[in-house]
Amino acid sequence: MTRQTPPSVQIHHTGHDHWILSIQDTSGTVFLLDSKNPRQTVSASTQIQMSRIYSSNGNMIPVNLPTVQQQTNSIDCGVFAIAYATEFCFNQYTGGKGLTFNTSVMRDHLLQCLSNKQLQPFPKVQPKKILK
């Protein structure tokens, strides 16, 4: 792995059958988006990968762990990582509430993007309006 300059995105394998996304925004701040980690912990493998990618001297770096939409099964982590990466590239999304992907069409959307050889933002669920 080689050092990257911001902005940058990287999909990581955690070493535990799981895929996550790291982002370094234009200010150099690093975010870790994990669709199946409500405790927000970082594996040793991921820490090593991120220090090699984002640290100028290979030391550990501070990482922000924002709240993100959590997957409801054990197989969608890769699709979520790609969706988050795409959202960052199009809209500078670095995590946080307010973004909910339409999980029922995520895989079909990814297949369509790959077929077209062009990523597009993943479909989202619109927030429900509250009637008064």
Regions found by a protein language model. Give the residues of each.
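Cysteine protease-like catalytic core of ubiquitin/ubiquitin-like
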Residues: 1-113
